[in-house]
Design a protein with these regions (language model features):
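NAD(P)H-binding glycine-rich loop region in Rossmannoid oxidoreductase-like domains
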Residues: 4, 38, 44-93, 97-100
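Oxidoreductase cofactor-interface core, primarily capturing Rossmann-like NAD(P)-dependent enzymes
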Residues: 22, 27, 116-213
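Conserved Rossmann-fold NAD(P)-dependent oxidoreductase catalytic core, especially the SDR/UDP-sugar
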Residues: 80, 85-130, 135, 142-144
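N-terminal Rossmann NAD(P)H-binding glycine-rich loop of SDR-like oxidoreductase domains
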Residues: 2-23
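Short, polar loop motifs at secondary-structure junctions
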Residues: 30-38
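SDR active-site strand-loop-helix element
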Residues: 6, 32, 69-70, 106-112, ...
Length: 213
């Protein structure tokens, strides 16, 4: 299988790259990034691109599956508009190009409670992206909605707080369906869904079931 990764420098993306490198069924890994992550492996081809200039890289989008796990915060992006551009526009445009290039499968990391009709900016944006991706002519589309993530060496204080709160409630028997999830569990689930060509929307309980095998 020839894999394409969008978001290889993020927490899930880093685990995904390693998962694919260690998998003997994966022949090639093409990553599309804005900066060089310094990955030195014979399977990996790094494309350093400007996502606003797709005419320069669109023909390089060749493979069997796209793994899309781009994600940022409003603080990191600098504004709502920039966050939308990174989280929605870049991912949708890449997916559209992949479909045009004949890539048959697309695996998207969305977010828990994503809903295009949500009154909240983040979950609405993620829901809108899901709906847009579903309209593209892929043979298989897998959408993952992970809960709060446990990232290695995270510096996001809000994320640390949300994980701590969820872990507290989990300890007293509440919100079990939203217990925090390690990024490597998400990465493993993504690979398994690509291999089995399972389409659908996968909620936290589904991701745990598949990703912890």
């Amino acid at each position: 299988m020839r894999a394409i990764i969008l978001g290889a420098t993020g927490a899930i993306g880093k685990d995904l790259v390693q998962e694919l490198i260690n998998d003997d069924t994966i022949e090639q890994i093409a990553i599309f990034v804005r900066r060089d992550p310094g990955i030195n492996n014979e399977k990996v081809t790094t494309h350093i691109v400007d996502f606003d200039q797709s005419d320069k890289w669109r023909l390089s989008v060749q493979g069997d599956v796209v793994f899309s796990c781009i994600g940022t915060t409003r603080k990191a992006a600098g504004s709502k508009d920039n966050q939308y551009k990174i989280d929605y526009t870049y991912q949708y445009n890449f997916a559209k190009i992949a479909a045009e290039q004949g890539v048959p499968s697309f695996v998207l990391v969305s977010a828990a409670m994503a809903n295009a009709n949500s009154p909240f900016f983040y979950t609405k944006m993620k829901g809108e992206l899901e709906e847009a991706i579903k309209q593209l002519p892929f043979q298989h589309i897998s959408i993952l909605r992970p809960p709060a993530l446990i990232r290695k060496n995270t510096t996001r204080n809000s994320e640390k707080l949300s994980v701590s709160i969820l872990q507290f409630f989990n300890q007293i028997g509440l919100l079990k369906s939203q217990r925090p999830m390690k990024t490597e569990v998400v990465a493993h689930c993504m690979v398994e869904l690509a291999k089995t060509k399972k389409s659908g929307v996968f909620e936290p309980k589904d991701i745990f079931k598949i990703g912890e095998r």
